[in-house]
Amino acid sequence: MYLINQNGWIEVICGSMFSGKSEELIRRVRRTQFAKQHAIVFKPCIDNRYSEEDVVSHNGLKVKAVPVSASKDIFEHITEEMDVIAIDEVQFFDGDIVEVVQVLANRGYRVIVAGLDQDFRGLPFGQVPQLMAIAEHVTKLQAVCSACGSPASRTQRLIDGEPAAFDDPIILVGASESYEPRCRHCHAVPTKQR
């Protein structure tokens, strides 16, 4: 599945918050380094929760990353000796990320992206569904529901300990202070009173 002599391909790692997406991306990047492959990691500038210039998992694993403001900025950092391009928090990138990932894979790079497949409302998030559709390999991870202990496929946003309303802003960068993993049955999204 991961033979480097193959032409380029796309791998998507997705799931809810706290499911281990960044941890899995870091693991795959580290494996490429053991194989003497050259990897570069990108993250959106908006993701500054733990570090400005590292991808950091919730359990503290980290790898150096290049923060970029726009998807097409990724091209400025790619060199011929690169084998693997990794992109974390891909849901925060602009709509051009799908084209950027396609171009990189078509040029022969192994492209690994990680991100939320659903927003806090349980709806498809950003460009992740499109990336899943064009990827050769998709890994969907689950966390453990913080309410009942079942497998969690959704991300619950909390505002002062209560579920956020459906029409609250989609993007709010945060961690355990704002989000919990939830299963389908414990996930709640009330409609906001007008």
Curated annotation (Swiss-Prot):
Residues that, per the record, bind ATP: 15-22, 88-91
Top-rank taxon, per record: Bacteria
Molecular function in Gene Ontology: ATP binding; thymidine kinase activity; zinc ion binding
Record's subcellular location: Cytoplasm
EC numbers on record: 2.7.1.21
Keyword Zinc among UniProt keywords: yes
Catalytic site positions: 89 (proton acceptor)
Disulfide bonding pattern of the chain: none
GO annotation, cellular component aspect: cytosol
Example GO BP: DNA biosynthetic process
Amino-acid biosynthesis in keyword set: no
Enzyme class: transferase
Catalytic activity: thymidine + ATP = dTMP + ADP + H(+)
Residues at which Zn(2+) binds: 145, 148, 183, 186
Keyword field: ATP-binding, Cytoplasm, DNA synthesis, Kinase, Metal-binding, Nucleotide-binding, Transferase, Zinc
PANTHER family: THYMIDINE KINASE (PTHR11441), THYMIDINE KINASE, CYTOSOLIC (PTHR11441:SF0)
Family: Belongs to the thymidine kinase family.
Subunit structure, as described in the record: Homotetramer.
HAMAP family to which the protein is assigned, alphabetical: Thymidine_kinase
Record's protein name: Thymidine kinase
Taxonomic source organism: Bacillus cereus (strain AH820)
